[in-house]
């Protein structure tokens, strides 16, 4: 009797748990008895993945936090190396969490285990020399976006473009009215979605310019509604504080809901750069990007960033489809002028291009990831 396929797999945070779940399902369609072991969250565990450690162990952000947890992280890594070298899987798949996974993948690859890194780190954008570390640690990288594969190809590093799971999850057309009902927003007025980011540092920098932009918009369009998506109670309190300070007279509808519903319900979107810009593109809503970071980070970014643009829709199109106001340009006046333009125009060229790009990256990523990994095992 043939022994079942064994796949080592590690996800370091919730987004990785979702990717792992889809990947496991797709592999099991072809190999129902396949075994998965490593570190996963609730979704992967529900698919039958055996988790050797709690995923929370890896979900640390920020330099100070990581340093505090370093001894524990090193111990977990050492135990995983020992486990996988004593019980070698047919392949190891590290999902995202590059700081942890790439180091582990390097050790496993040196021990003769095939390794895959799922979700390319942003090497194309900054610290491009990391590509040599990635090459040393992996047999294959799975990339969400076509320009990522083009970058790896330039360095002859094996990479497969699998499409983006968000492009699979979001329908080609998204209905505004049901989203408004869901959020309790009036149907007969225009709404601007205000998305000041999900991290404390982002809200600290962006709440004030975004709120002051809304102040200017309210003077010009008294009937315009403002709906704000906030990821948790901490971010809500942070935004409320800024609201009280800068524009207590304005009426913001605060929503503890995903950005996706808030974007879908809106007529235009003012957002912090990040994955949310890609989501907004896939939902076909006109947007403007505003972003500020502290002076030191800005200084580093200027020297290190290798891309013309910061938002994914522009990087993907290699064109300024979406206005980006960064640092000193991220002012209420600039944002106000662009939001006004978006509200008064039909934005057809922008939205048509969004639809075209949705098709580019909609490839059934779960299935593509499974195919690429299984092909590597069979090599």
Swiss-Prot record:
Q: What is its EC number?
A: 2.4.1.182
Which keywords does the record carry? Glycosyltransferase, Lipid A biosynthesis, Lipid biosynthesis, Lipid metabolism, Transferase
* Any one GO BP annotation for this protein: lipid A biosynthetic process
Q: Would I find Lipid metabolism among this entry's keywords?
A: yes
One MF annotation (Gene Ontology) recorded for this entry: lipid-A-disaccharide synthase activity
Read off the InterPro entries from this record.
Glyco_trans_19 (IPR003835)
User: Which reaction is this enzyme known to catalyze?
Assistant: a lipid X + a UDP-2-N,3-O-bis[(3R)-3-hydroxyacyl]-alpha-D-glucosamine = a lipid A disaccharide + UDP + H(+)
SUPFAM superfamilies tied to this protein: UDP-Glycosyltransferase/glycogen phosphorylase
Q: In which pathway does it act?
A: Bacterial outer membrane biogenesis; LPS lipid A biosynthesis
**A Gene Ontology cellular-component term:** membrane
**By its UniProt entry, which Pfam families does this protein fall under?**
LpxB
Top-level taxon of origin: Bacteria
Would the keyword ATP-binding turn up in this protein's UniProt record? no
Provide the family line: Belongs to the LpxB family.
What function does the entry list?
Condensation of UDP-2,3-diacylglucosamine and 2,3-diacylglucosamine-1-phosphate to form lipid A disaccharide, a precursor of lipid A, a phosphorylated glycolipid that anchors the lipopolysaccharide to the outer membrane of the cell.
- What NCBIfam families does UniProt report for this protein, alphabetically? lpxB
Q: What is this protein called?
A: Lipid-A-disaccharide synthase
Give the encoding gene's name.
lpxB
């Amino acid at each position: 009797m043939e022994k079942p396929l064994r796949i080592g797999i590690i996800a370091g945070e919730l987004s990785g748990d979702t990717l792992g779940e889809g990947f496991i399902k797709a592999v099991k369609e072809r190999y129902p008895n396949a075994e998965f072991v490593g570190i996963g969250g609730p979704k992967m565990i529900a698919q039958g993945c055996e988790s050797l450690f709690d995923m929370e162990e890896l979900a640390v952000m920020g330099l100070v936090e990581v340093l505090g947890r370093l001894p524990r992280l090193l111990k977990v890594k050492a135990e995983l190396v020992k486990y996988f070298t004593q019980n070698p899987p047919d392949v190891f798949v590290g999902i995202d969490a590059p700081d942890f996974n790439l180091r582990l993948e390097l050790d496993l690859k040196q021990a003769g285990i095939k390794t895959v890194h799922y979700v390319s780190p942003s090497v194309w954008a900054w610290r491009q020399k990391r590509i040599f570390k990635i090459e040393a640690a992996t047999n294959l990288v799975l990339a969400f976006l076509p320009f990522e594969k083009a970058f790896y190809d330039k360095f002859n590093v094996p990479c497969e473009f699998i499409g983006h799971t968000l492009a699979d999850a979001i329908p080609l057309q998204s209905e505004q009215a049901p989203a408004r009902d869901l959020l309790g927003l009036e149907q007969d007025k225009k709404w601007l979605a205000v998305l000041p980011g999900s991290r404390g540092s982002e809200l600290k920098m962006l709440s004030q310019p975004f709120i002051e932009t809304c102040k200017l918009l309210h003077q010009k369009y008294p009937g315009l509604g403002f709906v704000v998506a906030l990821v948790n109670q901490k971010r809500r309190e942070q935004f409320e504080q800024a609201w009280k300070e800068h524009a207590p007279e304005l009426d913001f509808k605060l929503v503890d809901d995903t950005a996706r519903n808030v974007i879908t319900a809106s007529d235009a979107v003012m957002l912090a750069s990040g994955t949310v810009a890609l989501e907004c593109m896939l939902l076909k809503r006109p947007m403007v990007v505003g972003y500020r970071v502290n002076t030191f980070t800005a200084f580093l970014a200027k020297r290190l960033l290798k891309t013309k643009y910061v938002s994914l829709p522009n990087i993907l199109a290699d064109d300024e489809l979406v206005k980006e106001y960064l640092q000193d340009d991220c002012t209420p006046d600039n944002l106000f002028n662009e939001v006004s333009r978006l509200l008064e125009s039909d934005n057809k060229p922008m939205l048509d291009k969004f639809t075209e790009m949705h098709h580019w990256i909609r490839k059934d990523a779960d299935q593509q990831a499974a195919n690429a990994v299984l092909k590597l095992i069979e090599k």
